[in-house]
Amino acid sequence: MTESEIPKEYNASEVEEKWMDKWDLSMYHFNWGEDPRPQYIIDTPPPYPTGNFHIGNALNWCYIDFVARYKRMRGYNVMFPQGWDCHGLPTEVKVEEIHGITKNQVPRAEFRKMCRELTAGNIDKMRKTMLRLGFSVDWSNEFITMDPSYFVKTQKSFVRMYNKDYIYHEEHPVNWCPRCETAIAFAEVEYETRQTKLNFVHFDKVDIATTRPELMAACVAVAVNPEDKRYSQYVGQEITVPLFGQKVTLIADEDVEPEFGTGAVMICTFGDKQDVRWWVKYELPLIKAIDKQGKMTKAAGKYEGLSIAECREAVVADLKAAGFLYDQKPLEQNVGLCWRCDTPIEILSEPQWFVKIDNDAILKAADEIKWYPEYMKVRLQNWTGTMEWDWCISRQRIFATPIPIWHCKKCGEVMVAEESWLPIDPNEAAPKKACACGSTEFEPETDVLDTWMDSSITALHVTGWESEHDLRLPAQIRPQGHDIIRTWAFYTILRSLALEGKRPWDSIVINGMVLGPDGHKMSKSLGNVISPEEVTTKYSADAFRQWGAVGGSTGSDVMFRWKDVVSASRFLQKMWSIYRFSMSHLKGFGQEDAEKFQKDSLHIIDRWLLSKLNRLVDTATKELDDYQFDSTFKAIRGFAWEVLADNYLELVKGRLYGDDPEGKRAAQYVLYRTTKTLSLLLAPFIPFFAEELYSRLSDESVHTQAWPAVDESLINEEAEAAGELIKEITGEVRRYKSELGMALNAPLKKLEIYNADIDTGDIAGAANSKVELMEGAPSFEYVPVEVKPNMGILGPRFRKDAGAVVKALKAESPAAIEAQAASGKITVNVDGKPIELEPEAVEIRKEVISGGREVDVLEVRGAVVVIVR
């Protein structure tokens, strides 16, 4: 195949479209049967199907695909499943918007159907993007959490954990979003610093400071520090709450900070978690002043029906009018927000379903898992250490997995579904047996499960839990973002331990977030959002994947920059040019020829390259084993561009175009081995490009090939040292030609090399010169031939007379000026007057004479190169 038969420009869109059509995706399928290969199951994150497979998703899936493709090549039976985490509030809100309804205006089943239809369409859109990016997903193991085949497992896990006493139902303070009208877990609370006011209020015996005056209606005690002498005389006495009139006790507790505000604080039900702690500790009464919609209740008296903000404003005004409010000060406060809608959360006491948390067991399991990077484990440890409440798993929504529970109307007992009844929606089907009290009348549980109850069993699902297959837990790896360590990672470990008593995975690899070109988190409001489709349309999927590979080390945040994609696209063209050149010289040379080739006919520079190539394979293997994608790809790119293209190809052109068949054969062998190996090394990262290269070398897919093995016999330090010297000598000769304005292929009469025992053939070809290795030391005579005045010194000193000084210098012989300079001063006559100059005022150009010839001399790492022009 000649260069003219291969297009000069690499057409990425054409190549990628071709292979998307040609690839048989069954080559990515996991074998559930007996298989001699070790399993490698990936607990893939199931994204929320918004219809937009955003760039953060795409980066994570690049990482997953790098691993999946690499592990297949390493001989593993790989499962790269694809899941979709369907349930949740955003879909409900979108359905209401699309259909112009609220969820309560249509039957529950009809609303769920609308949600399912929207979700199915969104999944189709996202699936197309994933295919376009070349992800080697095992679509035979796709799962969709809203499908009965999946949520039956969610329900089954609930039933088993309930029967094992992991799950319970009781009224308890919970985080509540008034806008979403649902409970949320602590892991779903995000915090933001906001400005508020600290209000100073007279009570009848003490003054308190509060940021929540609207909660005075729910004040059940006042607390001070026992060491605070200002209030010690009042501890145990009753105090009347202004405006609302209830009498509360003043208690002493060590958690009160005397320096904050007045040193006296209200205990309300509930302003924050500290209120809950005190409420439990002192068995205080419960006053519900805020309802589920964020409105004030009857307990607030005349403020009933007001929103929280309206009530706060009204109470402050009334306190001021009555003379109770005596000061207000600005305060920065960390406010807990709902992760979905950014509404400040409230803590309400509501009956909910909870999962018990065993912090010690979770920490022990986390220690059994290998974390990449290791420091990310600290995030899980820190989060676990702050857990005070059990996991609230019930939600007051519709589009989610139904809780398989009924409540007996007669005795109030809970009826939990039997596993054989599942999947089931208790709002659509009654229990298949009577209650223990004999009653057959039940109230269905209308709450649904937290979506994390669906996604926290993905590790179980993909390893065959409750299926026709044998359980293969633990999975080998969980790839995920650092933002969901406290949710998805935490809950998955909890559930795996509760249901199977095992860790969910052997390893967890954490990826960072994608930042916009401006360095900020991508958001529509900032106008810095880039979609994967935008990149693939403008450049290519392989260019996008390269950006993902080199953007940052594992766990770090990655900035999207167009210049990185441009650089990636240039590398594809560079590799294509390397391949095009190589293939033009491999006509008639294939795998059979490579197998028959006798390696003892290799030149030093061939051994140098093959040694470097095998070191590259060794490095890439070790780095990928540690999920270091950036360093792996940079090493491959550096080898291809700097070692192969910039040096080896230039050095062997003489042999490839020459008439030495044995030397040419050796170069062909190296080109074949190197091109094929690079195709394999690039396959996990840029699968379309690698397939295009490999298809010209083999009828098989590169993605069904084994990862290249390191040939230790070809790693040769002596060859590398000699090759480096050859490379550097050739580089210096090329630089020499460039500085003289010569063409790089311009002929030189001869190169004489001293102090080097190297193969000169490839230097001769690259330099277009005869080359001789010389014995002994070179003998040089340096003859001064020109005096160059330093006008930087002469100009400022002599000004208008500088020309006369230059003329006087030129009148002297270069040898005479050199001799004077050696003595420390130079004297010249200008208009009959002697002028003294420092040696730095001139530069003496010398010619090098060797053997009676004018030559140029280069020194390269101890070797001396004499150039005869």
From Swiss-Prot:
ATP binds at K524. PROSITE patterns: AA_TRNA_LIGASE_I (PS00178). GO terms for molecular function: aminoacyl-tRNA deacylase activity; ATP binding; valine-tRNA ligase activity. ValRS has two distinct active sites: one for aminoacylation and one for editing. The misactivated threonine is translocated from the active site to the editing site. Keywords: Aminoacyl-tRNA synthetase, ATP-binding, Cytoplasm, Ligase, Nucleotide-binding, Protein biosynthesis. Belongs to the class-I aminoacyl-tRNA synthetase family. ValS type 2 subfamily. A motif ('HIGH' region) lies at residues 47-57. It catalyses: tRNA(Val) + L-valine + ATP = L-valyl-tRNA(Val) + AMP + diphosphate. GO terms for cellular component: cytosol. A motif ('KMSKS' region) lies at residues 521-525. The gene is valS. Catalyzes the attachment of valine to tRNA(Val). As ValRS can inadvertently accommodate and process structurally similar amino acids such as threonine, to avoid such errors, it has a 'posttransfer' editing activity that hydrolyzes mischarged Thr-tRNA(Val) in a tRNA-dependent manner. Its EC number is 6.1.1.9. GO terms for biological process: valyl-tRNA aminoacylation. This is Valine--tRNA ligase. Gene3D superfamilies: 3.30.720.200, HUPs (3.40.50.620), Isoleucyl-tRNA Synthetase, Domain 1 (1.10.730.10). It is an enzyme of class 6 (ligase).
